[in-house]
């Protein structure tokens, strides 16, 4: 089958004169805005001023993008050392979620301290929003035909009862691939539903955020095993190492904070 015979989606959404606007950026931006809406709405319900999350996003998103790119470049340094002009080129992908998460957490801690609010309260409120943004953001990878898995057949993809536009987009340079972006996106959407339900359980403060870290990490660990473009450190897939680490750290934090009496307040308490 010729590549030209398989209709595919253009990664460029619109052309503004000489400047292409990529779907990747539009999708990432959509995830940020929907996440902000969700966090702002819940924040107001819990007594957080509306502009708090707006201000946080305006600071955290650029820093998260910077950290996500730095993280990616560090583990792909062999390529970028030879192509330094490409280090700042993020129009077609190259943002590592774990790097972005590190940047967002650092920013959140400093922001909360400056505003005189509990970081854990902000983190709990933001947890479903972050996961929603990640679920939506994976569709940017879909448009870029990246973050896919190993080779499969068209029959395999049809057996998953996927719509043609997904199957066709997974046809890259003459080969069909696992739509790992979809697996992770669906896992994340399920996680959003779980976190929204757990809000009503009134967990101890901070534990909704740790639940997010555990949920995301478990899914990412298994999906990462299918991918062909993993960032590597020797024989290890960095994302899998990070995922295991986040699960362990989250469980330790939950136990230690409870034993030390640092998790006495509940999610719904002001």
Swiss-Prot record:
Q: Looking at the keywords, is Transmembrane helix present? A: yes
Q: Please list the GO biological process terms of this entry.
A: lipoprotein biosynthetic process
Give the record's pathway: Protein modification; lipoprotein biosynthesis (diacylglyceryl transfer)
Q: Which residues form the signal peptide?
A: none
> Which residues of this UniProt protein bind a 1,2-diacyl-sn-glycero-3-phospho-(1'-sn-glycerol)?
138
Q: Which family does it belong to?
A: Belongs to the Lgt family.
- The domain of life for this entry's organism is Bacteria
Lineage at the top is: Bacteria, Bacillati, Bacillota, Bacilli, Bacillales
* Role this protein plays: Catalyzes the transfer of the diacylglyceryl group from phosphatidylglycerol to the sulfhydryl group of the N-terminal cysteine of a prolipoprotein, the first step in the formation of mature lipoproteins.
Give GO cellular component annotations, separated by semicolons. Answer: plasma membrane
Specify the enzyme's EC class, one word.
Answer: transferase
PROSITE patterns xref list: LGT (PS01311)
| Location(s), subcellular | Cell membrane
Q: Which PANTHER family match?
A: PHOSPHATIDYLGLYCEROL--PROLIPOPROTEIN DIACYLGLYCERYL TRANSFERASE, PROLIPOPROTEIN DIACYLGLYCERYL TRANSFERASE
Q: Which protein is depicted? A: Phosphatidylglycerol--prolipoprotein diacylglyceryl transferase
Kindly state which keywords UniProt assigns to this record, in alphabetical order. Cell membrane, Membrane, Transferase, Transmembrane, Transmembrane helix
Q: Name one GO molecular function term.
A: phosphatidylglycerol-prolipoprotein diacylglyceryl transferase activity
Annotated TM spans: 19-39, 56-76, 92-112, 116-136, 178-198, 206-226, 236-256
Task: Name the Enzyme Commission number(s) assigned to this protein.
Answer: 2.5.1.145
Membrane topology per the entry is:
Multi-pass membrane protein
- The answer, when asked if DNA damage is one of the entry's keywords, is no
């Amino acid at each position: 089958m010729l590549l030209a015979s398989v209709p595919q989606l253009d990664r460029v959404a619109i052309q503004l004169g000489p400047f292409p606007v990529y779907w990747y950026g539009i999708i990432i931006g959509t995830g940020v805005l929907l996440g902000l809406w969700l966090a702002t709405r819940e924040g107001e319900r819990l007594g957080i001023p509306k502009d708090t999350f707006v201000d946080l996003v305006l600071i955290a998103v650029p820093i998260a993008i910077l950290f996500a790119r730095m993280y990616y470049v560090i583990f792909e340094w062999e390529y970028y050392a030879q192509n330094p002009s490409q280090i700042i080129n993020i129009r077609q992908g190259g943002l590592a979620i774990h790097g972005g998460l590190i940047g967002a957490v650092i920013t959140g801690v400093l922001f909360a301290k400056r505003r005189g609010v509990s970081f854990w309260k902000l983190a709990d409120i933001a947890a479903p929003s972050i996961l929603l943004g990640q679920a939506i953001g994976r569709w940017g990878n879909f448009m870029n035909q990246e973050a896919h898995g190993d080779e499969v057949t068209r029959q395999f993809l049809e057996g998953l009862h996927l719509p043609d536009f997904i199957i066709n987009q997974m046809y890259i340079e003459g080969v069909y691939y696992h739509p790992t972006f979809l697996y992770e996106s669906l896992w994340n959407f399920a996680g959003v539903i779980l976190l929204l339900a757990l809000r009503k359980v009134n967990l101890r403060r901070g534990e909704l955020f740790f639940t997010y870290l555990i949920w995301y990490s478990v899914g990412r660990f298994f999906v990462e095993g299918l991918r062909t473009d993993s960032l590597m450190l020797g024989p290890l897939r960095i994302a899998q190492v990070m995922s295991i680490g986040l699960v362990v750290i989250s469980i330790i934090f939950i136990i230690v904070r409870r034993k030390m009496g640092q998790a006495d307040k509940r999610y719904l308490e002001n």
